[in-house]
Amino acid sequence: MGNVCKDILLSNGGSFWVATTSGISHYDATDKKWKSFTQANGGLIGLNARRLSLDAKGQLWAAFYDGGVSVYNPTMEMWTNHGVGEGKLPVGTVTDVWVDAEGVAWVTSFSGGLAKYANNKWETIKQEQGLPTNSLLGITPGADGSLWLSSVAGAIQYKGDKFTSLTKSVNKLPDDNVRNILFAPDGSMYICTNTGLQVRNLTTNEYTNYGASNGFISSYVNHVAFDAKGNRWISCWTEGFYLMTKEGVFYKIGTTEGFTPTDVYMARFNEKGELYVCTNDGIFILKNPDSLVQKLTSTEPTLPSHSLIVAPNPASSYTELQGANASAEVRLTTLDGVLLRKMQCDALGALRIGLEGITPGTYFLVVGSKAYRLLVSE
């Protein structure tokens, strides 16, 4: 089986499934044996497996970018394929699959839109039905029952048969090409794009962008994994693997730590807290992530950590900003992104902001790649 691993599903006890560009493999921790499935010896619909999902019956659903969807029945030990055709999938370039609690399978595809499989029948939802784009890259369930779709036209929420988009122009995403969407334990949304990462609070719409503009990642962000202590483990294509501590400080994980791959697709924790990392060079298993955190945080961070202060907040006649980068641009906007004022910090990264003429209410102070909520009172 090939070394390029795109996804992994971990089971209690150490067994797991792996999606690769050469098929699908299963590791049985009890027997300590591997079993691989391909088109030739397993009857898969394709070879380039992208994502995996387990349904309530224990069946494995696999998305293939070169064919469609294959479903494995562990009792029968056989695969069932869903390909392209009338009443089937619209295209074979499937990018993701997820099965909800009711057993409905949701499938995203590149150029074919969104598809759902229920009661042994496929239904396709495309631009003609209001989908902003037919080129989708992934699917993530929301806590409110909605579906979030990664796409070439931003992050798309599908709820109640309606679509709502988060985009670069309106919602200040780093890029409209969204590769993945994840939710942290605190409910924050992590939007992975081709030019960086946005962390967004969906309740307040406050956000922070991490990308080329603040020196972090200048290329493709694939995935974010969250550990129990608030640290984030960021997988990047061409840029490798990063640790983002709960304090927001970044460390590059590289050859010093024994990590050599440049293309990292995703990472997942098992029930023991061990981290399995899918890369272009196989699976790397980090048995004790805490020890690596301790080692990295005892060294200089990859990027400086800036502490920015906005006070007073709430404010009436003025507020002051401290801790920004020297001569950083500051914009005062409405919550909808309408620009009200544009200013510049001094050489020390400080700025006094007069609020004369600003109607009492809630606004955003956008400083570089970060947005801070400012409450203007009477």
Language model region names:
Residues 1-302:
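Carboxylate-rich, polar loop motifs that coordinate divalent cations or form catalytic acidic clusters
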Residues 303-311, 315-378:
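C-terminal outer-membrane/trafficking sorting elements
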